[in-house]
From Swiss-Prot:
Molecular functions (GO terms): 3-isopropylmalate dehydratase activity; 4 iron, 4 sulfur cluster binding; metal ion binding
Protein name: 3-isopropylmalate dehydratase large subunit
EC number from the UniProt entry: 4.2.1.33
SUPFAM superfamilies in alphabetical order: Aconitase iron-sulfur domain
CDD domains per the UniProt record, alphabetical: IPMI
Similarity comment text for this entry: Belongs to the aconitase/IPM isomerase family. LeuC type 1 subfamily.
Keyword Cell membrane belongs to the record: no
Domain of life: Bacteria
Pathway note: Amino-acid biosynthesis; L-leucine biosynthesis; L-leucine from 3-methyl-2-oxobutanoate: step 2/4
Annotated function: Catalyzes the isomerization between 2-isopropylmalate and 3-isopropylmalate, via the formation of 2-isopropylmaleate.
Keyword field: 4Fe-4S, Amino-acid biosynthesis, Branched-chain amino acid biosynthesis, Iron, Iron-sulfur, Leucine biosynthesis, Lyase, Metal-binding
Keyword Cell inner membrane part of the UniProt annotation: no
Assembly and interaction partners: Heterodimer of LeuC and LeuD.
Taxonomic lineage of the native organism: Bacteria, Bacillati, Actinomycetota, Actinomycetes, Bifidobacteriales
Organism: Bifidobacterium longum (strain NCC 2705)
Amino acid sequence: MGTTLAEKVWADHLVRKGSDGAPDLLYIDLMLMHEVTSPQAFEGLRLAGRKPRHVDQLIATEDHNTPTVDIDRPNPDETSALQLTTLEKNCKEFGVRLHPLGDADQGIVHAFAPILGLTQPGMTIVCGDSHTSTHGAFGALAFGIGTSEVEHVMATQTLSLKPFKTMAVNVNGKLPADATAKDIILAIIAKIGTGGGQGYVIEYRGEAIRNLTMDERMTVCNMSIEAGARAGMIAPDETTFEYLKGRPHAPEGELWDQAVAYWKTLKTDDDAVFDKVVDIDATKLGPYVTWGTNPGQGLPITASVPEPGKIADATKRAAAERAITYMGLKPGMPIKDIAVDTVFIGSCTNGRIDDLRQAAAIMKGHRKAENIHRVLVVPASSRVRLQAEKEGLDKVFKDFGAEWRNAGCSMCLGMNPDKLVPNERSISTSNRNFEGRQGKGSRTHLASPAVAAATAIRGTISSPADL
């Protein structure tokens, strides 16, 4: 019997096979770090008198707590400032490469690494961050870990893990012109639920996936964790190789040829058997938006807020009632009737150059609606920001009435100055819409950059087709 992509990468990194139910010992190629989940790991090394096993395979950046304006001024939040200075001190002490605020390569941890060519097919990649699954778009086995595991990888460059189950999500057919990668993943999560992928590595397959750019593939893999999965993967192909060729950390010359030859073997065998298979008809997809307080509460933009009384399952009915109350909505109201206060375009889900181009193309020649308080456009990395400015996208955003910011996690989460106030409603290209995610009492609707841009123009949740 053949093996899946995930199983191949696992086997290639197996240091020791566990026996009698014990976990395997897996070699880790790359660990990415940021200021939030690394302090305790560094302190653990310090107390034990250890040094990193392979310091050249550890790379850090500042992203979660960083301001996106006035980056040359002192951070107004004492806790955030402490975490940032602590990371800088720790990296200096232990010799870990750091891309700090203001650095040309600084950015969200899951954005700067692919741009630099650090993320490559067949690698094992970890980070103390849920959305490490983003790197699976390259055919890497990438997943988030806890702080104690961060310390373990620093000390040994290995992890003890039991093999994950495998799931195939086949996105069959061609994607309609008005549907995007974000709509694909929101539709998948709506179908299987936020726990549907628990314990699995999801491999995204099918014509619609193959037709995506690398930026779009990263969007899909990024939100694997929102489906409960440990990781998401897409087999590498010519699109992957073209993206990587010539990047700073990509192999060159004969080493490039050798790498590509290996990368081409990283695909699921025809006779491999997945533990679970899910099929999605891409031809029937369109713009999706979340209405509730978890990423699984998503619907086509043409739908209406659910009526809890029509939900048979008592648990789901109660969850819908709570979500509708928290979100300040009414059962049965059309999604397109929901007025929005703030628009956020950015994050490790949708802050890449393809995303900014998508939003700018829709905004060009328009102004934001009067009821929209602010539109924040935040590139996922400093290199994305520079590329956008080279293309004149920043001017499009500014002419529209949007704020063009520096790179960072920004309004994806309430850990930096970019927050919503209680009862403020946003449409956001980020990945989570939990209660209070964007600030205490915040109300978040997840959507694609295209829908976010159209909403900013009309003032109510809209798709480009509504313009």
